[in-house]
């Protein structure tokens, strides 16, 4: 066997060891996260929390590379925080994301069908490679960042962005009038913060007292200010 062939075999074996190590690390991480979720649920039960939301454990995919991130194509996803994530026009023929022009923001609890997960480099020599989820909207293709590659290893945050189970099923214990307000993108007195997030997207809390909380919602250009007391909305007014 030639020296070149030996080097190729050694390189292939080394690569296989690295891949196996990454996979093993991912499995351990996934099991650790599942263990923490189970512990959190058990603690909630022991504390006797009456809020059923504490017992909801949304499924996570724990993606760690391009291949595992493509699990997003296997089921619909729903946006967790509306008006937070910017998406861009995507050319599927050229596999190119138009980072120069923002196409919009993902909406609250918007349902998406992820068609593919690809990589892309934004303009600029110092920009890091981005991981993009490709979807269609009104017949056009778009891509939204779901992670990046700082130094040879992806940091993927799609589990923080999307539900992979229908929120209507996860939170089926919510009353029908709450879901109706959410679908109409309205915040009503008595809603909790999660329900308000579902209705009008991400909010930014003010610093203040622990027993009373004020949260400001950009709401896609129609700002709202909501005051919560005891975890429930007591005042809703237009923001500025």
Language-model segments: residues:
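Short, Lys/Arg-rich N-terminal segment immediately upstream of the first membrane anchor
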Residues: 1-7
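Hydrophobic single-pass membrane-insertion segments
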Residues: 24-36
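A cross-family detector of function-defining hotspots
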Residues: 28-31, 120, 126-128, 172-240
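SH3-family beta-barrel domains
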Residues: 37-97, 161
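Basic/aromatic-rich interaction segments and small domains that mediate binding to polyanionic partners
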Residues: 47-49, 121-141
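Boundary regions of SH3-family modules and the immediately adjacent low-complexity/disordered segments
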Residues: 133-171
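Conserved beta-strand/loop element in small beta-rich adapter and peptidoglycan-binding domains
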Residues: 97-123
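Hydrophobic membrane-insertion alpha-helices, especially the h-region
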Residues: 10-27
